[in-house]
Amino acid sequence: MNHAIVEQIERRRASIIGFLAGLVRAASPNPPGDTRRVADLIAGRLRATSVDFQVLSDEPRKPNIVARLGAGRPELLFTSHMDTVPVGNPKAWRHDPFGAELVGSRLHGRGAADAKASLAAMVAAMEALGTVLPLHGTLTLTAVSDEEVGGVKGTEYLVDRGILHPDHVVVGEITANRLATAEKGVLWLRIVTHGRAAHGSTPWEGSNAISAMLRVLDAIETQVGGALRGMTHPLTPPPSLSIGTIRGGVATNVVPDWCEATLDRRTLPSETIPEAVAQVERVIAELHRADPTLQADLEVIQSGPPIETPLDAPIVQAAQAVARRLELPDAPVGYQQASDGRFFAERGVPTILFGPGQPELAHTVDEFVDVHDVITAAKFYALLALRMLGGADERS
């Protein structure tokens, strides 16, 4: 059966690549996050198979597709996202960002790697598996919206409404077809400093909120950033802290009474989100104790815990076996960015990441994916599903 599935995917190579090209041409930058064209293409593809699916959403522009094969437990979830980051300056691109140009084996375009390649491969795997029913359990595929801006209308929507109850999760993200078992957590913070407005010619009559913010940010970078230096994890990159935005003031000749900054903090699997928040809270509290006139508020914009799936988890063991079958590296790696996997990992569901595309190409100009890697990923997903849900013969 394994050989037959691999051969079936190989025979459909041109169709799979053409499907991916169509997904790339269906622009879905977020913001605004309208993924209806992508969802229509996926729905059309699934409609031509034996796969049952639903389109679920509480916002029409941001649909989510939930497709299922088989029934009962265990449930294996394949998930990836339909939205992309914006193009930026189109003139900076050598290839039309929505042209899906195939140059050699490279298919170019926004979302080609992140993450429409994974989507195309997962759909192809489900198509192939639809010919070998019954499975011993359920294979679920979700093609979600809103991942690039936090997943509220996508995976979080599906999880919070009890639509998904997987026992194992595979997140389609750009890992260069490497098995990733760990991922850094994400924490976005907003800091607001308060001052007192005055005329720019008499700043001593006011209190400058931007100056206060500079003190706050300098202390955070020095103390929190300093504490992060030297921290490591065997799989993920180091923890990080970055000032993302800053704004304040209304005019050059007015002492600003308000300033806002946002921070991007990425945590190691060995850290917790509450600990990371407390680090920043302590810095602000110390500044206020030293100078009670300094007023700063801290708010969590969004957060997601890190992922670290044990290497003896069945999904990891199965993924390693499939990687060896396809002559791929089987040593686990870490994933640098954040993914929708956090919604499952925080609920204790064993979660891994795997997908075609080089991680360094995410969100870049002239993004591309090697189509050979897309076909390999489709084979990986299909063989993994067979190993998890195909019965004892397929696990041997």
What are these regions (language model features)?
Residues 1-4, 11, 54-57, 181, ...:
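Metal-dependent amide/peptide-bond hydrolase catalytic core
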Residues 49, 131-135, 163, 286-293, ...:
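Short helix-capping segments at alpha-helix termini
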Residues 115-188, 389, 393:
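Acidic/histidine-rich catalytic neighborhood of metal-dependent amide-processing enzymes
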Residues 1-90, 105, 258-262, 279-282:
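N-terminal helical capping/dimerization or prosegment-like subdomains
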Residues 87-103, 166, 181-192, 321, ...:
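Acidic-glycine-rich active-site phosphate/pyrophosphate-binding loop
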Residues 75-140, 365:
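Active-site metal-coordination/substrate-binding segment of hydrolases
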Residues 54, 77, 140-142, 297:
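A structural signal for isolated positions on well-ordered beta-strands in alpha/beta enzyme cores
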